[in-house]
């Protein structure tokens, strides 16, 4: 669908859930005083006790207005929805599916899902075949009429950030973007060389696909011309 929305009433084939990977949890520490700052970049998950999670999930669900509530399991893992704005420059390759550029996608994930897994899930859903390393997930925060965008680490957990910030997207929202040119400077030379190999492979695949299409088209055209000029 062009909106990228996955409804609970839709057929299972169209309801997309990111693959869940379970990580060894760090022992829960004491809760931080005050509201956590959603603008501060974190490398790892800020783990809460089961009681703190239960309280926050209840508070979150009480504030939900679109029925996209979170569900808390007995093991302390919770599931819920995040909305991601797809701000891609162009489709990675021709596809009969609607373009993902500029649409809003609702994704059902677990509290154990990382940013890296969310990126991979979104790219799979929109049939984007380019490497996930070419994309980044940003959190967009709104504070006092100011908008702040911060790129998230691959090890962060988007659903935790959503839980802490609450359900309002005008307070916190997520955006998927392609890496800007200047951001490639952060990668090592072997990584950049690997990206080039991936691009070369994608370019070759596109070229071979184009050649096959035009070869088939030429063959059909020649067959049609042969039928026209065949003696009666």
UniProtKB/Swiss-Prot annotation:
SMART domains: RA (SM00314). GO terms for biological process: signal transduction. Transmembrane segments: none annotated. Residues 37-46 have a biased composition (Basic and acidic residues). The modification N-acetylserine is found at residue 2. Residues 78-180 form the Ras-associating domain. It comes from the Eukaryota. GO terms for molecular function: identical protein binding. This is Ras association domain-containing protein 3. It comes from Mus musculus (Mouse).
């Amino acid at each position: 669908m062009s909106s990228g929305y996955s409804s609970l009433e839709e057929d299972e084939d169209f309801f997309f859930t990111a693959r869940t990977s379970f990580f060894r949890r760090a022992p829960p520490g004491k809760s931080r005083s005050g509201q956590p700052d959603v603008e501060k970049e974190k490398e790892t998950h800020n783990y809460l006790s089961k009681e703190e999670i239960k309280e926050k999930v209840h508070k979150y669900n009480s504030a939900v207005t679109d029925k996209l509530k979170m569900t808390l399991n007995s093991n302390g893992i919770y599931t819920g929805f995040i909305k991601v704005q797809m701000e891609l420059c162009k489709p990675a390759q021709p596809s009969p599916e609607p373009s993902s550029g500029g649409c809003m996608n609702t994704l059902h994930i677990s509290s154990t899902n990382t940013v890296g897994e969310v990126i991979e899930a979104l790219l799979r859903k929109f049939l984007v075949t380019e490497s996930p390393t070419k994309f980044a997930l940003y959190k967009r925060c709104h504070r006092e009429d100011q908008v702040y965008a911060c790129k998230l680490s691959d090890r962060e957990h988007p659903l935790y950030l959503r839980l802490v910030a609450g359900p309002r997207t005008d307070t916190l929202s997520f955006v998927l973007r392609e890496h800007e040119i200047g951001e490639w400077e952060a990668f090592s030379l072997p990584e950049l060389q690997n990206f080039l190999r991936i691009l070369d492979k994608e370019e070759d695949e596109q070229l071979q696909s184009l050649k096959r299409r035009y070869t088939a088209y030429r063959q059909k055209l020649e067959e049609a011309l042969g039928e026209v000029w065949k003696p009666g």
